[in-house]
Amino acid sequence: QEEVIPYLLGENNDVVALAQTGTGKTAAFGLPLIQKINVKNRIPQSLILCPTRELCLQIAGDLNDYSKYITGLRVLPVYGGSSIDSQIRALKQGVHIIVATPGRLLDLMERKTVSLTTIQNVVMDEADEMLNMGFTDSINAILADVPQERNTLLFSATMSPEIARISKKYLRDAKEITIGRKNESTSNVKHVVFTVHAKDKYAALKRIVDYYPQIYGIIFCRTRKETQEIADKLMQDGYNADSLHGELSQAQRDTVMQKFRIRNLQILVATDVAARGLDVDDLTHVINYGLPDDTESYTHRSGRTGRAGKTGTSIAIINLREKGKMREI
């Protein structure tokens, strides 16, 4: 916030900010955006793009909190899986800030129910996640409709070649702000690896969970099937666990996430994609039951614990064949 806010209050100041989740970035871009809004002019002035519905709602909620003493400022979350008609109605009534997932925003653009010609500021939050989820073409189409004369801010946990390419394409003389070192995981996280035979993996997981009775954490699996199987086994064995993956309906996912947020649920077994929109500050543990494919994904997972000055533990349960991959990570 110290780095970003003063810079963003200026004009024509593009920013690439490399920051882990949990570093206060919503306020870093949100406060200057709110400051720049002309409330009397009820047209879209700022656009925030983010990868998931959950993050979209969370950012919109934060912006509403920050601006609650500014009479008449309107923030509209635009996301799939909800009524498009109510979003179209809100756009007709006039909004100042649009927080959107790329897919639903494109849909509205194609229906000619939203115009981006008055946008002065664009934020791409968790840009690396949006690219990982295959939104590159959507982002290109959206930014082609936004005026060239704009401020563009790109927030990403890691500096991948794709992020470098997209910032070169859309940002002008961007200031690069790095909170912590590039691509590093947060220093408040202790990393632990347990090597076991493949057949003993679930037994090892139970031992770990038993060793930390106060655990409040996420267990990451690689597939939806494995996620459901592990969650079912843990529940059968009496643990306070549940699953989160793409085969659940939106209503089921919302229920599970809400239970987890308010700590009615101790252990969430999840896929990477399903957990993307979940933002919880005080997780004690992240357990990699299935190793991710690359260091970036591992950094994202482990960055969910050890936030906001607290300490956390990232545990990987690997089999003998995965030792080389773990060493690379």
Q: What does each of the following model-derived ranges do?
A:
Residues Q1-I329:
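Conserved helicase RecA-like core
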